[in-house]
């Protein structure tokens, strides 16, 4: 099983290569309204158990939040539920904005 955390640069590299990834934004809708990563699916942390079927995919599941704490917990929980490909993007959308795409608003 791969490490639970993945760097934003690795996520970007995999996306740019055309690899199919399921990017899951586990933040709240009010946070999503402020900034988002194009192509990500919003599934707030509290609704993950009810949406587990969406995450039952052959694609690698990359979770992210604001700084990487909530997404780490979600990825860990998903692995316990059998989603072995679940990973957390280290540093969250904040790090994505700083290192990958400065057009993504910081908050």
Predicted regions and their residues:
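Rhodanese-like catalytic fold shared by cysteine-dependent sulfurtransferases
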Residues: 1-21, 29-60, 69-107
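Short, surface-exposed ligand- or partner-binding patches at beta-edge/loop junctions that are enriched
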Residues: 64-65
């Amino acid at each position: 099983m791969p490490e639970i955390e993945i760097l934003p640069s690795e996520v970007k590299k995999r996306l740019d290569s055309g690899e199919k990834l399921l990017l899951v934004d586990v933040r709240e809708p009010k946070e999503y309204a402020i900034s988002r990563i194009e192509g990500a699916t919003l599934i707030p942390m509290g609704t993950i158990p009810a949406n587990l079927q969406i995450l039952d995919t052959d694609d690698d599941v990359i979770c992210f939040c604001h700084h990487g704490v909530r997404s780490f917990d979600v990825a860990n929980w998903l692995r316990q539920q059998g989603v072995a490909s679940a990973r957390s993007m280290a540093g969250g959308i904040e790090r994505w904005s700083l290192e990958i795409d400065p057009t993504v608003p910081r908050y």
